[in-house]
Amino acid sequence: MAITKEEVISFIENMSVLELANLVKELEEKFGVSAAAPVAVAAAGPAAGPAESAEEKTEFDVILKAAGANKIAVIKVVRGLTSLGLKEAKDLVDGAPQPVKTGISKEEAADAQKQLVEAGAEVEVK
């Protein structure tokens, strides 16, 4: 007697998360496939980016590339632009290149870039 699809689904529904994870791993090894398809779908999303570049971009990211010579002034500006504490702002500046602000308007990005450059930082707006 063959097992029906419904019986297989019912059996899988009653498995614990650990048992299900082991089953997936065994199936991947047996059939030489990967269950990471959602990652591949998400990676395909940015491919549409160049087509959208014809339209005007509405969200920008301010990236701190380097702190420059006056790191203390840059840390102060980063704290002013964000809601970060002193340690977090210092870690961000020390870890450059890092995003300072993401998903902001063109005007806000230009203002943030101006403040950071005046403090001596090297900044990129994407």
Curated annotation (Swiss-Prot):
<dbReference type="InterPro" id="IPR008932">
    <property type="entry name" value="Ribosomal_bL12_oligo"/>
</dbReference>
<dbReference type="InterPro" id="IPR013823">
    <property type="entry name" value="Ribosomal_bL12_C"/>
</dbReference>
<dbReference type="GO" id="GO:0003735">
    <property type="term" value="F:structural constituent of ribosome"/>
</dbReference>
<dbReference type="InterPro" id="IPR000206">
    <property type="entry name" value="Ribosomal_bL12"/>
</dbReference>
<dbReference type="GO" id="GO:0006412">
    <property type="term" value="P:translation"/>
</dbReference>
<dbReference type="InterPro" id="IPR036235">
    <property type="entry name" value="Ribosomal_bL12_oligo_N_sf"/>
</dbReference>
<dbReference type="Pfam" id="PF16320">
    <property type="entry name" value="Ribosomal_L12_N"/>
</dbReference>
<comment type="function">
    <text>Forms part of the ribosomal stalk which helps the ribosome interact with GTP-bound translation factors. Is thus essential for accurate translation.</text>
</comment>
<keyword id="KW-0687">Ribonucleoprotein</keyword>
<comment type="similarity">
    <text>Belongs to the bacterial ribosomal protein bL12 family.</text>
</comment>
<dbReference type="Pfam" id="PF00542">
    <property type="entry name" value="Ribosomal_L12"/>
</dbReference>
<keyword id="KW-0689">Ribosomal protein</keyword>
<dbReference type="GO" id="GO:0003729">
    <property type="term" value="F:mRNA binding"/>
</dbReference>
<comment type="subunit">
    <text>Homodimer. Part of the ribosomal stalk of the 50S ribosomal subunit. Forms a multimeric L10(L12)X complex, where L10 forms an elongated spine to which 2 to 4 L12 dimers bind in a sequential fashion. Binds GTP-bound translation factors.</text>
</comment>
<protein>
    <recommendedName>
        <fullName>Large ribosomal subunit protein bL12</fullName>
    </recommendedName>
</protein>
<dbReference type="InterPro" id="IPR014719">
    <property type="entry name" value="Ribosomal_bL12_C/ClpS-like"/>
</dbReference>
<dbReference type="GO" id="GO:0022625">
    <property type="term" value="C:cytosolic large ribosomal subunit"/>
</dbReference>
